[in-house]
Amino acid sequence: AEADPKNEKTYRANAEKYKEKIRAAVSEADAKLAKIDAPRILVTGHDAFNYFGKHFDLEVHATDFISTEAKRSAKEIDDLATLIASKKIPTIFLDNQANPQAIKSLQEAVHAKGWDVKISDAELYADSLGAEPGVDTYLGAFTHNVDAVAEALAK
């Protein structure tokens, strides 16, 4: 608006419309994710979902943390596998930024503890958008993530 004052009203109106779309998406997400029973635990490949978990009251655990180069120790992975098996978490998630082998290794560790955890078919979008239509916008990726988590964990 400062760079193009003659169109300021249009920019501000568009911003308000977009904010309303965000509020509506969050409200819908609140309703969908509220259906997840305890344990309300989200396991992903990257801790980028901590903000998501905090807002939607989900405990978030990741196989990678801080960055895609920072890996968990073998003990931390074993502890996470124990948590998943003991809480009978049904599904863990790959995301578009993390090492898929870490999630697959975690799944194997959980299986060794006697629990059949699934890896979701729906990849989550962390820290970036997808290239495909539907996940190539903030709202599209957000809605996709909400739907994937709700479908996998709200059973």
Regions found by a protein language model. Give the residues of each.
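Extracytoplasmic metal-acquisition and chelation regions
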Residues: 1-155
